[in-house]
Amino acid sequence: MKKILFVLFACLCVMTACTSQKETRTRAEQIREQLLTCDENSVIVVAHRADWRNFPENSLEAVQSAIDMGVDMLELDVQRTKDGVLMLMHDHNLDRTTTGTGNIADTNWEDIVKLNLKDHQGNVTVYKVPTLEDVLLMCKDKIMINLDKADRYFDEVFSLLEKTGTTNLIVMKGGQPAKEVKEKFGKYLEKVIYMPVVNVDKPESEQAIQNFLEELKPVAFELCWNNPESQVPAKMAKDLKGRSLIWYNTLWNWLCAGHHDDLALEDPDGTYGFMIDSLGARILQTDRPQMMIEYLRSRNLHE
């Protein structure tokens, strides 16, 4: 009897220690570990340009809103001003999303900071264009960030990551071949996660994936496909299981063979569920993060 009680007590101590360890890790560290360990027990939700339905895309307010709703990762776009300030904006010019005009690369930061952001319907708001540093400090310890368009000046981006202590937040991605990625970003890959983007409609896609597995062993692949007849996505679900997580985008038809967010309004099982159950998706980038999180929680696939 004493032996049984001792074993039970030891098990309780181990469970308590594990729980305590998880609680001491930041939210960002927990998500990063999920990536690094290829954890398939839940689905990572990525908010495309943050919560742009409620606030201007790539704004601090959209970022904070996404954090508050429980998003795991943000997809944010980086541009550089004429005087070298790294800032958030998708387009290379100011016209669509601000009250200004002209190319960002031809405009100094002191002029951009005077502008107001527009929402997705073109209405002028009170919100301002953020710098990348502003966003990194806001996100620190709270959420992962997928930086898009940042590879063009990644030396400068990395310096900013080190300055703010946020190298562990970042997922970089791109469509370059494995050897080129290794040559270009090799010195950063121990600190920053790199994820290849592969269009599986292309005949060379399977070889490209194999090259990455041999050269870099990426924690995840972003797969894009537009051909609903293709068997490659289902094959990748089997081939990559236990090796790399699979990321799919539910943004537009041509990225996901029609299994997009707006279709999920009526049929979440046929869109999100299909990608999770049939294609092995464990990372989903969405324009409807709140709806996706609610669906995943109903299936115990998200906290």
Model-derived features with residue positions:
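Bacterial Sec-dependent N-terminal signal peptides
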Residues: 1-27
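Phosphate-group recognition and catalysis centered on beta-loop-alpha active-site segments
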Residues: 18-303
